[in-house]
């Protein structure tokens, strides 16, 4: 991907959500390793928490990076059922998805919670993938721009320039997640350009042009090539298609 200040390396991440036991996860990654070893983009898999230690172990020495799907913002304490950024850091996890629409929708995560998680991730050497996007109602009411730019501004509140440069943002229109509906490449690119413009207004040209922004929402082998040809799309956050080695490797090897 071409940025004004140099190349932005494409990043394609698979979000497995609440799928795959440890054995199933190992089988999937063992199938993936030879299929994606020549990939020109950065490849990330995000398995469920219990699978992270094993997946971290078997991806060692490969070009596959490992991400978590979520984390809490406190380092430790009486927070039953939560996983801390320190725990992920000690596992040498590379990335962490923050603010996924399912977290916002089902677990009532707010932009303020997302902001705390972003800060905690950076404190523990994790690169966050910040998810933003609008619902079908918001899209139909013509407030996509307002909703998405607000999520970006509140999510990035008080983050430093050097942190935002490392960050990945994923634009995932909520109406296109798991529905089989996909934003057209032009629609996705338009909103992603808006996200970049919002970051530019907060941090300036250099940061905005260095920042990688993915599209997420029913990404498939049949849609990826066109999506990746767009000027502002730097990668994909892949859901269902990341659970099949053939599909995910076809997406990763889109060129």
Swiss-Prot record:
GO cellular component: cytosol
Gene3D superfamilies: Aldolase class I
Compartment(s) where it occurs, according to its Swiss-Prot or TrEMBL record: Cytoplasm
GO molecular function: triose-phosphate isomerase activity
Residues bound to substrate: 15-17, 178, 218, 239-240
Main location: cytoplasm
Active site residues according to the UniProt entry: 100 (electrophile), 172 (proton acceptor)
One Pfam family from the record: TIM
Family: Belongs to the triosephosphate isomerase family.
Function, in words: Involved in the gluconeogenesis. Catalyzes stereospecifically the conversion of dihydroxyacetone phosphate (DHAP) to D-glyceraldehyde-3-phosphate (G3P).
Protein name, as recorded: Triosephosphate isomerase
